[in-house]
Amino acid sequence: MEIKKATLYITEMKLIIPFAASYGTYEKRESIVIELEDTDGYIGFGEVVAFSEPWYTEETVKTALHVLQDFLLLDLLKAEISHPNEVPSLFKHIKRNRMAKAGIEGAVWDLYAKRQKQSLATLLGGNRSEIEVGVVIGINTIPTMLKQIEKYAEEGYERFKVKIKPEHDYELLKEIRKEFPNIPLMADANSAYTLADTEKLKRLDEFRLMMIEQPLADYDFLDHAQLQKKIETPICLDESIHSLEDARVAITLGSCRVVNIKPGRVGGLTESVQIHNYCMEHNIPVWCGGMVEMGISRAQNVALASLPNFTIPGDISASSRHWERDIISPEVMLEGGKVRVPQSIEREYEVDRGRLEEITKQRIIFER
C-alpha cells in the first residue's frame, strides 16, 4: 500500500449529557478524524481520541495535530506498507504521542480491511459475532447517578462503571448497592487516590466490586502492587498501561489483576492485540475501555473486543449514549445488552460523510 493522500478533519460534537470524572467535566468533544487514500483508490478512516486538555495523558488535540502535520504524515506519505502491523515500526523514532499514532494506524487497518475484503474483527483475530458491553456513569449527585443506572439497566447494559473520587466514593457505592444489590459494578478512580488512602480503599471491599480501576497515579506500579496485597477488590490498570512493556511490568510486579486496553492509549490496534495476547498467556483478563469517542474509534473497539480474552464487558456503549447523531452508519446500537460485531466487509460501519462535514471546524490535506 502507498498512501497518496491524507486528510485531517478537526471536529467538535456536543455531548448529550456532560461527562464528569475525577479530573474534570466536559460538554463538547473535540477530535481529529484521519482519512487516508491509497494509490488504488481505497480509503480508510481513523480517529485521534486525545482530549482538548492534558488531563488523561499528556496528549491533546493540539499536540496531536502538531505531531501529525509535522512528523507522522510526512513519514507515512513516503512509505510503502504491506500490512498495518508495520506502522508502529515506521513511527518508532517518534517518542510517545501514541494517540496520534493510533489514529493513523486505525485508518491503515480500515483501508487494509477494505483491500482484503475482510472484516476488521476477522483480521485482528476476533472470534465472536456479538459482544457484551457496559456503560460509564460520570460523577454527579447520588440521586442522579442512581437514576442513570436505572435507565441504562432498562436499556440492557450488562455492566456498570461509576466514576469516584475521595469525597465521592463510599456513600455513593453504598447507595448503589442498596438500590441495585446484584448488578455487575466497578469503580473508576482515574488516579484520584494515593497509598495513604489504603484504609479508605479497603472499605470499598464490602461492595463486591468487579474491580477498582486506576486508583493510584499512572507511574505507581510499586504502590499499586502494595495496595493490591492489602485490598480484596481486584485492581485494574488503565492510565498505567501505555505499551506491552508496561503490561509486562504490571503483571510481573502484581500491580493488577485486570488490564484495560484502549487502542489510543497504547498506540494502536497492533499493540492492543499484543497486550491482549500477553495477558491471555498470563491469565489476566482484559476489557476494552472507552474515550468518549465518536463512531470511527467506537467501531474499531467493537472489532478489537471480539478477541477471546476480552472476557469483561467493555466501555463500548451505543452511539446514542453520547451523541444525538454519530458520524457512522449504522450507528453502534445496543440489542439485548450486546453490540453486533461485523463479520464481513459488506456489514462494516461506514463513515457518514454528511455528518462529518457538519461537525468539521477545519480540514487539512496532505498529498504524496
Go through the PLM ranges and name each one:
Residues 1-44, 49-55, 323-325:
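Structured beta-strand/loop patches that form or line metal/cofactor-binding pockets in enzymes
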Residues 1-5, 118-129:
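N-terminal amphipathic alpha-helix/helix-capping segment at the start of soluble metabolic enzymes
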Residues 5, 37-39, 43-115:
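Metal- or metallocofactor-binding catalytic centers and their adjacent structured scaffolds
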Residues 34, 41, 104, 117, ...:
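Conserved, mostly hydrophobic/aromatic
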Residues 48, 135-137, 162-164, 187-191, ...:
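A cross-domain feature marking catalytic cores of carbohydrate-active enzymes
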Residues 122-231:
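Metal-dependent enolase-superfamily TIM-barrel catalytic cores that perform enediolate-based chemistry
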Residues 219-236, 241-338:
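Shared catalytic-loop signature of beta/alpha-barrel
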Residues 321-368:
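C-terminal extensions of enzymes
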